[in-house]
């Protein structure tokens, strides 16, 4: 049984940089890219929900229906990777919100980021709950074979009913 559809509002967020850095020893990566703020999947356990509260929005339904994207993401990434002082290290994509949520079909933000990664042969990892990741197999496959990319698909449970309750708008476990 599918979750009730939400009307999604998509708004641009004009970032100055695209690669976020962290120095926490508790996180398995020190560089990340999140093409979106907010996530249409609506996972009840999501730890990223407070990011909307920091913007004066609800971490509940606003987080699921008011999505922000970075239209200049690919250009910003290309600028950062081209800097003479850039030190190449693996970048994690999707550590905060899913890079392949439904709105990605329209924006292709994640796809444009992957195209830059491919041109620069920039190592990365990516995680999702969406079957939309298969769309980008033409990039992920060759880069994976070259040891430049790792792709992860998260499956919380194989129980479809429980998955729908926990992750109402994510791809079903069977499809993942």
Predicted regions and their residues:
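Conserved Radical SAM active-site core
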Residues: 2-36, 44-152, 156-164, 172-176
């Amino acid at each position: 049984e599918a979750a009730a559809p939400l009307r999604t509002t998509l708004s641009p967020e004009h970032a100055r940089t695209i690669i976020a850095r962290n120095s926490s020893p508790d996180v398995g990566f020190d560089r990340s890219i999140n093409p979106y703020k907010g996530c249409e999947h609506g996972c009840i356990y999501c730890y990223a929900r407070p990011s909307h509260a920091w913007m004066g929005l609800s971490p509940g339904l606003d987080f699921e229906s008011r999505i922000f994207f970075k239209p200049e993401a690919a250009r910003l990434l290309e600028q950062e990777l081209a800097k003479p002082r850039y030190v190449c290290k693996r970048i994690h994509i999707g550590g905060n919100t899913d890079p392949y949520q439904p709105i990605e079909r329209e924006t292709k933000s994640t796809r444009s980021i992957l195209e830059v990664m491919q041109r620069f042969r920039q190592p990365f990892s990516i995680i999702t709950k969406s079957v939309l990741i298969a769309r980008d197999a033409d990039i992920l496959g060759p880069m994976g074979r070259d040891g430049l990319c790792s792709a992860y698909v998260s499956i919380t449970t194989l129980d479809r009913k429980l998955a729908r309750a926990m992750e109402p708008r994510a791809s079903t476990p069977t499809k993942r």
